[in-house]
Amino acid sequence: MSNTEQLREMAKTLVTPHKGILAADQSPRTMNKQLEALGLPPEAELRRKYRQLLFTTEGLQEYVTGVILHDGTIRNHADDGTEFSDLLIAKGVVPIIKVDKSTVPHTNFEGEVVTQGLDGLADRLQEYYDMGARAAKWRAVFTISENTPTEQNILFDCMTLARYAALCQEAGIVPMVEPEVLFSGSHSLERAEEVTTMVLQKLFEQLQWNNVDLEGVILKSSMVLAGSEWSEQTSAADVAQATLRTFMNSVPPEVPGIVFLSGGQTPQRATENLDAIAELEAQEGGFPWELAFSFSRGLEQPVQEAWQGKDENIEAAQAALIKRLQLNSMADQGTYDPSME
């Protein structure tokens, strides 16, 4: 099988119907904040134990195709010495590696950021491939305000995403491209749709200019939502309409799948919106791409609350993870109901 065929096969596997992708790629800094919110010390060993809790959950592979890992996590191991990546592979779950090196201010563009991490990326991808990673993730961030995002900022980040994607495919790794349009802000649903459409159109233009094989790419996208500070919060039905209209106007049919980030929504709201999107998709007779979930907070918040850093709570925390995964799997089929919570 050629490299192109292998990439396309892996991309399809990652968007297997009614399964999702667990985003467990919080940086040590973000994970430490989550530990502190539970009243726990921000320690490396607690971070490792938490990841072990997630990855050893019985039945995880029934609901997820892949898990996104931070660099520190793919290099870490379970209590018995098994590398986390090997533990996942043994379950039939694909290790996905986050490879960007976070954001820095975009010089001369106030209030905007760009993502860094291209330097040395080809070598890092080779190392991650050898460690078992078969997909990667790179996140760009766009803030909506009266003056942002600018065309220049969108172009810069989309060029970077395209270069990253090309390097991934060269290394035999499926690129997940994540242009996140932030939920925070006081923008309307219409403005969110306008910006998300603009960003996605520019992204796919750049991917095509860089000869990236779109059949070997996964898009990780925001849902289209009015800003968190906008006076009227969007109904699930309106989110579904705006999101699917945006995709129809910007995502080429060759792309095998689109996975959603939860992006600061509560776990229940993210699930409700996913369900509305699936219901609308069924009404419309389907779309060219598989649609799935790739939540972090939207899956893990209840897990952390159940765990509280205590070994005696591991079973309850793992049960909370399976419950959230089941609810999102049902939402992905349009069969979720809030009474199931």
Model-derived features with residue positions:
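Hydrophobic residues within beta-strands of alpha/beta enzymes
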Residues: 67, 136, 175-176, 217, ...
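Conserved, mostly hydrophobic/aromatic
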Residues: 43, 138, 177, 219, ...
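Helix-rich catalytic cores of soluble enzyme domains
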Residues: 121-207
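Short, histidine-centered active-site or binding-site loop motifs used for metal coordination
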Residues: 101, 142, 181, 223-225
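Alpha/beta catalytic barrel-like cores
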Residues: 1-131, 144, 232, 236, ...
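Residues that line or immediately flank small-molecule/substrate-binding pockets and catalytic motifs
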Residues: 71, 140, 221
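Catalytic core of soluble alpha/beta enzymes
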Residues: 183-254
